[in-house]
Design a protein with these regions (language model features):
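FNR/FR-type flavoprotein reductase catalytic core
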Residues: 1-99
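Short acidic, gly/pro-rich beta-turn/loop elements at beta-sheet edges
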Residues: 13, 102, 126
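Alpha-helix termini
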Residues: 19, 81, 114-116, 132
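Local cysteine-cluster metal-coordination motifs and their immediate loop/turn environment
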Residues: 71, 95-120
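Short Fe-S-cluster ligation motifs
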Residues: 106, 117, 122, 126-134
Length: 134
């Protein structure tokens, strides 16, 4: 499994203990990056889409899971299309659409789905079937 995890700066990285444990595993290729490093940062510096481009994962037996700020998702999606990923094998999370989180307010309704109850993770193929803005 290959993981690309990014943050704006080192101090904003979450799950540091869990990431340290993942770095010890042979079955996880962990790529941690920050947009802006500081003098203490020894890791990669760069945007998630650029790190993904450098890795260039094979589409064979692979799915892409993209989670993050909308701008990062928008910049990363075209890369996976360029690499040949199908819309069925690209997943993203729409939790930013949720308000109440229990399906009562209707604010996260997109087509026939409630993001809070039916998601928040959907493939792009699933999202294509929904009407409305996502």
């Amino acid at each position: 499994m290959t993981v690309v995890y990014g943050a704006r700066m080192p101090g904003l990285l979450l799950y540091k203990e869990e990431l340290a444990a993942c770095e010890l595993r042979d079955d996880i290729d962990l790529n941690i990056t920050v947009d802006r490093g500081d003098e203490s940062w020894k890791g990669k510096v760069g945007f998630v889409p650029n790190i993904c481009r450098d890795i260039s994962p094979s589409v064979e037996n692979t799915v892409a899971l993209i989670c993050g700020p909308p701008i990062m998702v928008r910049l990363t999606l075209p890369l996976f299309f360029e690499l040949g990923f199908s819309r069925e094998n690209i997943y993203t999370s729409l939790e930013m659409r949720m308000k109440c989180g229990i399906g009562k307010c209707g604010r996260c309704n997109v087509g026939s789905k409630y993001i809070c109850k039916d998601g928040p993770v959907f493939s792009l193929a699933e999202l294509d079937q929904l009407t409305g803005e996502y």
